[in-house]
Amino acid sequence: MSGFKADLNTKLGGNQWLKLNASFGHMLYPKINLAYNFRNSELDVYDMDNLVMNQRFLQHKFRVYLSENYSRTFCIGVGYEIENLTPMKVMYSLYDAVDSDYKGINTLGTFAYLHFDNLNKNRFPTRGVKGNIDFTWKDGTLSKKGIEKLHYGALTFGFEGYIPIVENRLVMIPQLYGSCLFGKGAVNGTTNGWNEMFKGPVPMYPSMNNLIGGAEMGRHIDQHLPFIGLNKISFAFNNVAIARLDIRTRLFKKHYLTAMFNYGRSSIDLNNFFKEKETLEWSEMYNYNASNWWGAGLRYSIDTKIGPLSLDISSSNISRKVNLYFNLGHFF
């Protein structure tokens, strides 16, 4: 609870990252933290089921912040951050007309977060709540014509509840995820040619977008939301909300079967969030109403010594096909 602490985490191989954190705390005062995060990511990004681009980018993020130093369930922090984001390779497939010659972007911003976790177990919990709310506001410049000044923010949240129906046998897991981007330089079409043309994502700078797809929240960027039935990473509009319900049953001692259902909506602005859109493609000009997404799947899991081993079978109205996903261990 008191004194100096430092930790280092890294991932080698594909999509490398490194996280270094140093902190000093005292029982009577907030904890003082210094953090450095590095990410080297390469990913294919889709416009729903059409490949838009393949991109590799480097991200450096420095943070100094204060956080609480006493709670086992709450985690609260506020501070400043400096971020450098550099596209190393941008290869377009769908929108070849967009200029890919972009330089690094530097931002200075403030951030705050509130995380809560009182789950009864780290693996396959049966009761409790886990949630997070993260807010950032960034000011930045780009040394390339197009985006000169940036003033934009992001509000991202996630919630998981574990409700036992039959003790140690059947669990209901409601979930809610969302992200909202706003300000000058966000993807609402206020600052550069791509935005003015499509009123949609800014693909060369992933951290200025919302992404959906896969099973893990925040895997590639902070505003990356999971969606069952979509294994590919896809762009989304400024405002995204996804509701999900899992029903998990324990078949044997360490074997589990989970039925998963989710529904999502995305729109350019909040005024259009509850208006229907006829097609899913964000590239359809002048149609800013919300898209409707749905997906469902089954997951078979085994609790092993090195972490969960699972196989997902899923589909959605976005992919329009059956998807398979195999996972071994934890994402952290």
Where are these regions (language model features)?
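Outer-membrane beta-barrel transmembrane domain signature
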Residues: 100, 104-108, 169, 173, ...
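Strand-connecting loop/turn motifs
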Residues: 13-17, 69-73, 128, 165-171, ...
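Membrane-embedded beta-strand positions of outer-membrane beta-barrel proteins
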Residues: 20-22, 34-36, 76-78, 112-114, ...
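Flexible, surface-exposed loop regions and adjacent strand-edge segments
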Residues: 37-42, 83, 92-100, 148-152, ...
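Membrane-embedded beta-strands of outer-membrane beta-barrel proteins
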Residues: 6-8, 22, 62-66, 112-114, ...
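C-terminal outer-membrane beta-barrel translocator/porin domains of Gram-negative envelope proteins
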Residues: 111-115, 119-251
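C-terminal beta-signal and terminal closure region of outer-membrane beta-barrel proteins
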Residues: 273-332
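Gram-negative/organellar outer-membrane beta-barrel architecture
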Residues: 1-111, 119, 123, 221, ...
